[in-house]
């Protein structure tokens, strides 16, 4: 969910089933409406097939006010940020991902791969709800080698 929505971990952990599942219509929602904790800005996010598949795998008649990522000790509470970090780190190790991986890596990875697939940075700025283009550029993590590739491939 975090990887395919580009949400900050605090917003991911605060998600409840009512946010992703329409209990009246008995189906998953097409969009997620989030008021971002950090900025207070509202963001509407389309739930792609990867997210919907994961949600369908996990949904088992949970109550509307249950958290998607609930604490095993306190079911009426989400897991902690530190527990989320441990889960992400373990998943990175198990899949052979090296380097400094954190929960925020999920958000940044979405943008990087979107950018590599041709999504303009201005659109990513809107998706991220960033206040400046500079922040978005930093998220994309463009390295010198990638800048060099532009010069090698654009020959007028």
List each model region and its residues.
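Catalytic phosphate/metal-binding cores of nucleic-acid and nucleotide-processing enzymes, i.e., regions
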Residues: 15, 41, 75-76, 96-97, ...
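Residue-level marker of regulatory loop/turn positions in helix-turn-helix DNA-binding domains and
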Residues: 80, 103-104
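Active-site/catalytic core of tyrosine-dependent DNA strand-transfer enzymes
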Residues: 48-98
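Catalytic-site neighborhood detector that most strongly recognizes the C-terminal catalytic loop/helix
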Residues: 34-36, 128-153
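Conserved tyrosine-mediated DNA breakage-rejoining catalytic core shared by Y-recombinases
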Residues: 14-51
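Active-site-proximal segment of tyrosine recombinases
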Residues: 11-13, 100-101, 111, 119-130, ...
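Short pre-functional
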Residues: 1-10, 33, 112-113
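Active-site His/Glu-centered metal-binding helix of metallohydrolases
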Residues: 106, 110
